[in-house]
Structure formats: C-alpha cells, structure tokens
Amino acid sequence: MADILLLDNVDSFTYNLVDQLRASGHQVVIYRNQIGAEVIIERLQHMEQPVLMLSPGPGTPSEAGCMPELLQRLRGQLPIIGICLGHQAIVEAYGGQVGQAGEILHGKASAIAHDGEGMFAGMANPLPVARYHSLVGSNIPADLTVNARSGEMVMAVRDDRRRVCGFQFHPESILTTHGARLLEQTLAWALAK
C-alpha cells in the first residue's frame, strides 16, 4: 500500500479522496497548502516510499499556497499525482499554460478518450468521468504525455520518467466510472520502479 501525503488545496472533494484512498488500505496524511513547503518536505523525508498527491481546489495554481513551490522542488524526487487544480499546477510547472476552458462543466459526467497505457490500462474507452472545472491546461510541453482528452481538451497527462501525472477530472467522484480502480492503477504506476 502507498504512503501518501495529500496536499489539501481547501476543497470539498479532499476528504472524498482521503476516504477512497484509506478504504483501499493506503496511509494518508493531510496538510493544507497554507503551511510552508519546508514542513511538508520534512514530513515526506520521514515517509517510506512517499507519494505526493495534489488535491482539487478553487482558483488558479499560482494562488494555491505552497503547491507551486513543492512542484518545483520535488518534481523528479518522488511520485506526484495531481487532481483538477493539482493537474493544472503540474501543467504549469512543466511550462504549459492554464486558461479558461471553452466548455465549463461543474458536476457533469463526460466521456474521455485515453491511450490505454499506464494508469488507463484495461479501462473502458471512452471512460465516463466527473468534471468540475472552468480552467484547462494547454500548450502541453514535450516532457508530458497527453494520455486522455475530451474532444480537444486535455484531461490527463503523465511523465513516465519522473512519475508525475495529473487528471483534470475527479477520479474520487461517484460520477467517475471505475474511479477507485483508476486511483489504484495510478498509484501502482507511480510506485513502479
């Protein structure tokens, strides 16, 4: 099972995610994004095979407390998984852009097309997922593989070398078909050597 530090970007979905992860047997500690990056880095150093998970949240990545600093300092040091705002922060940290989505969806199920690799191996394609966002990543740099889309909108990215990935959608939502399985496969991908 994974040892997860979940960065809480002050979102109502955070504890849905915590509950789903703990129900699968994972150890989860939660820190709010307002605390200093040093405190979180220190805690991660005392965890066995840590995974940093970046929660959904309001606003833009640059407004999300210590999250941008953590990404700059820890990318490539340990696996990082971002969801919604966390995904957008990953896109920005790699040099991509985040801006207004042409289509704003809050609490809607949407079918995404994916590449069937890594965390998406063996999953239905298209895959119904829950979307709650008005921002979207674009101009994705070459270090990130776009592994899922809804039309032209980027719905997931991954960096196989550094074990960093992000989902624009919410795998922890009841509207995401097989969300628990997707999270399990994502953690297995993140921890693969």
UniProtKB/Swiss-Prot annotation:
InterPro entries: Anth_synth/Amidotransfase, Class_I_gatase-like, GATASE, TrpG/PapA_dom. SUPFAM superfamilies: Class I glutamine amidotransferase-like (SSF52317). L-glutamine binds at residues 57-59, 88, 134-135. GO terms for molecular function: anthranilate phosphoribosyltransferase activity; anthranilate synthase activity. GO terms for biological process: L-tryptophan biosynthetic process; phenazine biosynthetic process. One of its GO terms (cellular component) is cytosol. Its EC number is 4.1.3.27. Keywords: Amino-acid biosynthesis, Aromatic amino acid biosynthesis, Glutamine amidotransferase, Lyase, Tryptophan biosynthesis. It comes from the Bacteria. The active site is at residues 84, 170, 172. It holds the Pfam family GATase. Gene3D superfamilies: 3.40.50.880. Residues 3-193 form the Glutamine amidotransferase type-1 domain. Pathway: Amino-acid biosynthesis; L-tryptophan biosynthesis; L-tryptophan from chorismate: step 1/5. It catalyses: chorismate + L-glutamine = anthranilate + pyruvate + L-glutamate + H(+). It is an enzyme of class 4 (lyase). Heterotetramer consisting of two non-identical subunits: a beta subunit (TrpG) and a large alpha subunit (TrpE). Part of a heterotetrameric complex that catalyzes the two-step biosynthesis of anthranilate, an intermediate in the biosynthesis of L-tryptophan. In the first step, the glutamine-binding beta subunit (TrpG) of anthranilate synthase (AS) provides the glutamine amidotransferase activity which generates ammonia as a substrate that, along with chorismate, is used in the second step, catalyzed by the large alpha subunit of AS (TrpE) to produce anthranilate. In the absence of TrpG, TrpE can synthesize anthranilate directly from chorismate and high concentrations of ammonia. This is Anthranilate synthase component 2. The gene is trpG.
